[in-house]
Amino acid sequence: MIDRTEDVPGAYELLTKGRELLRNGHPHQAALVLGKAKLLEPEKASIREALGRALYLSGWTLRARREFAKAVQIDPVNDYAHFALGLSCSKTGQRTRAIAHLKLAVAMRPSAEAYRRALAGVSG
């Protein structure tokens, strides 16, 4: 009998692979890998955030917004998740919600120029 459990990657390995795919410009493939990681560890904010990034970069903004919202729910002090949720909300017509999350991101990390630019862009 062959034991194949050693061949099955765990959530951490899948997260690492997904992040690598994102860094190398392959968001679609990253979304597939990170989706598998989410099935293994659905309450890990880091997986939800990375999956949200992959989905956002793949053009699946509504799905990305859901992942970022879950990441924020799991880890409310995750400034990047608030930032990304704000961007996703802005792209899906939820301006008020976008501003709220972008303000939180800026408050959590005032030195992040990208956060401030995004807030200014949405606020008008």
PLM regions: where:
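Alpha-helical segment of the N-proximal tetratricopeptide repeat
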Residues: 8-40
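Structural signature of tandem alpha-helical TPR/SEL1-like repeats
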Residues: 24-36, 58-70, 92-104
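Terminal, low-structured helical/coil segments at or just beyond the last alpha-helical repeat
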Residues: 1-3, 99-124
